[in-house]
Amino acid sequence: MFSKSLILRNYFSLLDSKLLDLWGSALKQFARGWGTLWLSMCLAGSAFAAEPAKSTATAAAKKPVAQAQRNTANAKPKAKTKAPVKARVDTRPSFGKVAGLHDVSDELSLKSSVALVVDQDTQEVLLSKNDSAVLPIASITKLMTALLITDAQLPMDEMITITQDDVDTEKGSRSRLQVGTSLARGELLHLALMASENRAAHALGRTYPGGLQVFVGLMNLKAKDIGMTDTRFVEPTGLSSKNQSSAKDLVTLVQTAHREPLLRDLSTSDSHVVDVGRHSLIYKTTNRLINNPSWDIGLQKTGYISEAGQCLVMQTKIAGRKLIMVFLDSAGKLSRTADAERVRRWVEAKHRAVVPQT
């Protein structure tokens, strides 16, 4: 089959050799224009004649597609599956790591960059590591929140409803306390201390007489009153890295909170069941040492945000001594309790070395 360009070249070549000498330049342009039009019509006609075959082929190709569409329409809809929700992982280094506190060594090779162990009765310091460093304290904050609630002697049976204001926008942390859930103040206090429930702690501060801002102001005033000179609070949960303190100050906080029987009981319980509507929720302690028979814990609180690392404070009895333990900025999920175990074995070993075995 000849191409359009080849036919045109042959045609104009013929005109140039036979006709143009006779008819002149004017007739030459007329002949060129008429010839181009005629050949274009011929080629277009041949292309048009071939089009039905293409349409037929296209129609034939569309039949399976149409059939497949009908089959899909008649098929039963498949159940939709939701993609699993992935927790937001924060990989930022802790303030202590950035400050180089982990480079400081200690005799027990602790994973915590800050540690302080004090005899509760004599105030003797048994172990100290970066105890004046001011760092974020995460949910250790909730001890101060709980202390204010008990100080105010608010009715523990008063019902409090979780609202949108209690939802964490700082870290996007999850909670099983849905907006609209109503629980007694005492139950919210229990969940805040034992299970470190953030919405519970925020609701306690939000519903305090005067509101949240008044509550936070009182947190700072209370800290000052009991001698916490390195401490600052900006909210009641510990989700903000601006809630900061030192190990020395936290020893004071633990000693003060330990005087409250309710805080001792709630912080050291291993589980609690709350009724929410037509179902129940089971909450468990965040401190794995609570159920360990080797430990006698009188008060405790755990904490974690990326800026603070793993944190743990406790009042406990080891080898007959009442001790206050503070561990901040521990690296690794289980490292804070592992550090506590190292200290316990160390204290017991020192006790055995001093007291003759009978």
Language-model features and meaning:
Residues 2-114, 349-358:
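N-terminal secretory targeting signals
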